[in-house]
């Protein structure tokens, strides 16, 4: 019999994370590296563990993540979103707790595009009166 695995994708800014959950001892692997090897900042690691700590599933699942695009902060957010969705697939009863914490909703904030005739998205070029 094949072991039970739960799959979900998470997104944040320009990062996309593919997450696989399987019952295990709590190992988190990101792009074939351990969580500590991949993320240097403690805040990123904390963000990733949030849904597991909230639902008391720390150490119950082995998590394998494949993440691409964006920077460390966006990737951490994408992994968090993916883990949340995978946990929901594993146990739909967690929906209320995760929804209340705001983990299910995809954070739609992204970089605003640069407009023509301007220096950036909102900033104007320097104005010279004379």
Swiss-Prot record:
Query: Which top-rank group of organisms is this from?
Result: Bacteria
Matching entries from PROSITE patterns are given as: RIBOSOMAL_S9
- GO MF assignments: RNA binding; structural constituent of ribosome
Gene Ontology BP terms = translation
Pfam families per the UniProt record, alphabetical: Ribosomal_S9
Show the segment(s) annotated as Disordered: 110-130
Name the InterPro entries on file: Ribosomal_Su5_D2-typ_SF (IPR020568), Ribosomal_uS9 (IPR000754), Ribosomal_uS9_bac/plastid (IPR023035), Ribosomal_uS9_CS (IPR020574), Ribsml_uS5_D2-typ_fold_subgr (IPR014721)
The UniProt keywords, alphabetically, are: Ribonucleoprotein, Ribosomal protein
Q: Where is the composition biased (Basic residues)?
A: 111-130
Task: List the GO terms this entry assigns under cellular component, sorted alphabetically.
Answer: cytosolic small ribosomal subunit
| Gene3D superfamilies recorded | 3.30.230.10
NCBIfam families assigned to the protein according to its UniProt record, in alphabetical order: PRK00132.1
- Family from the record: Belongs to the universal ribosomal protein uS9 family.
Protein name listed in UniProt: Small ribosomal subunit protein uS9
**Lineage, broadest ranks:** Bacteria, Pseudomonadati, Thermodesulfobacteriota, Desulfuromonadia, Desulfuromonadales
